[in-house]
Every structure is written in structure tokens, then in C-alpha cells.
């Protein structure tokens, strides 16, 4: 819903119409065939009076001066202690520590939250919340027992009445078990946890056949630009998600 500065501005306006409470914006810095206009997005965030930004993917260091000068609190999502410490060193105010259980990109270290969260608690001097596999009150109690200040839910919020995604997607998430995810793009050092479907099966067959020779172009049909078709149209087999 926020691929361009104009779309983000529209979403901010909607949020302000619905609540007078604080809300944040996510900025994800990932490899892309057509990278978003990050400076433009940040300009809209600042002009919109947003005071909390969650960054993810690559380091937010390049954009920290603009965000901090605007009085914005930055929470960076990290999948390792070393990345968390780096985020702390560049001025992030808090960390979202993302365990291997998470949907999406879990990093390359494969460390689950039962190990990762206590390590973060031992090393970090700034607050952190737990991410990855968080879904209910049990998750929150466990996260806080392991040293987190709270938790961050992602996939869980897709399966809500308010989420602007197709009902097929919501049902697939609710009906999935712990055995229904797959890890893809490991050989490209861009690991992603996705829900199993025929498109993912095709992708994994390509990975198996090509091995170390696999390139992004070999799997582009399964991963590039598929989200609108899946999330909005409900075509569950359009690609990996």
C-alpha cells in the first residue's frame, strides 16, 4: 500500500482519520529490481508527522540523520546479535529481534528466538522487542521471560478482519500448520520463509536442479511482482509468499 511517496501519503491520511494514537511506518531496504524512492518516502514520513519508523533489511545508517533530525524514533529489525549491535551503534533507538521462526526473511544464521532473545538481552543496551512466530498472549509472556520488552507481530495481523488482503490469504494462514512453510533462496543468501504452494514447489525444483549455478533470473517468475496478485486477487499459486 505504500510503494510510492504518493501512496504512502494517502495511507498516512487514512491512519490519521482512523486514530489519534501514535502509529509507525515500516521502511524495508531489500534488493529490488526497481528500488522504491526511499528519500521521497522519508520526506513524506517527516512531513506527515510520523514519529516512529521501523526499518528492516539493509542498514538504515544512510537515512538516520534525516530521521533523527526530525525527532523520529527508529526501530531496526535484526536477525542476529551482531546486526543488532551495529544498529545500536548507528543510533537506532530500539531493535526488533527477529528469530528464525519468522515468516519472510529470517537471515542466514538460523538462530531461533529461544537462543537469540537471551543473547540480545545480554548484549544490547537499548530496548528490544521479539519478532518471529509471535501470535498471542503466550508469545508475549515467553518473549518477556527471555528478556524482550515486548513483541512484534507480522503475519498474525494479515489474518485479521481489518487487513486489506484477500480472504483466500487469510484462510491459508489460519489453516496452515508448523509443517507448511518452506525456506527458499538459501543459495542466493536471501533466505525467505514462505508458505508451501505449487509455485514454491517449482522454485525449489529449480534450486535443486541448478544448485550453486542458480541465479535470481532463474526464479524471477516465482518471486518478482507476485504479491499484488496473491494478496489482492487471492491467486494463491501465483508465486512464493
Each model region followed by its residue ranges:
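Conserved active-site-proximal phosphate/metal-binding subdomains
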Residues: 107-129, 135-241
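Acidic, glycine-rich active-site loops and adjacent beta-strand->loop/helix elements
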Residues: 29, 101, 133-134, 156
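Active-site entrance/lid segments in N-terminal catalytic domains of soluble metabolic enzymes
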Residues: 1-124
Amino acid at each position: 500500500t505504500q510503494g510510492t511517496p504518493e501512496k504512502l501519503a494517502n495511507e498516512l491520511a487514512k491512519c490519521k482519520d482512523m486514530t489519534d494514537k501514535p502509529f509507525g511506518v515500516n521502511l524495508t531496504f531489500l534488493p529490488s529490481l526497481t528500488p522504491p524512492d526511499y528519500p521521497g518516502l522519508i520526506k513524506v514520513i517527516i512531513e506527515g508527522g510520523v514519529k516512529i519508523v521501523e526499518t528492516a533489511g539493509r542498514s538504515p545508517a544512510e537515512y538516520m540523520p534525516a530521521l533523527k533530525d526530525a525527532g523520529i524514533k527508529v526501530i531496526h529489525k535484526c536477525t542476529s546479535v551482531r546486526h543488532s549491535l551495529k544498529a545500536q551503534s548507528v543510533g537506532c533507538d530500539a531493535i526488533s529481534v527477529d528469530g528464525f521462526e519468522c515468516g519472510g526473511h529470517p537471515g542466514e544464521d538460523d538462530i531461533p528466538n529461544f537462543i537469540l532473545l537471551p543473547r540480545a538481552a545480554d548484549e544490547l543496551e537499548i530496548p528490544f522487542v521479539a519478532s518471529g512466530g509471535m501470535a498471542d498472549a503466550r508469545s508475549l509472556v515467553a518473549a518477556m521471560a527471555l528478556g524482550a520488552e515486548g513483541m512484534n507481530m507480522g503475519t498474525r495481523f494479515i489474518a485479521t478482519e481489518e487487513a486489506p488482503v484477500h480472504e483466500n490469504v487469510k484462510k491459508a494462514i489460519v489453516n496452515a500448520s508448523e509443517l507448511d512453510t518452506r525456506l527458499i533462496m538459501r543459495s542466493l543468501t536471501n533466505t525467505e520463509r514462505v508458505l508451501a504452494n505449487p509455485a514454491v514447489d517449482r522454485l525449489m525444483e529449480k534450486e535443486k536442479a541448478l544448485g550453486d549455478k542458480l541465479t535470481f533470473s532463474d526464479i524471477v517468475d516465482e518471486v518478482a511482482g507476485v504479491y499484488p496478485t496473491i494478496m489482492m486477487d487471492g491467486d494463491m499459486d501465483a508465486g512464493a509468499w
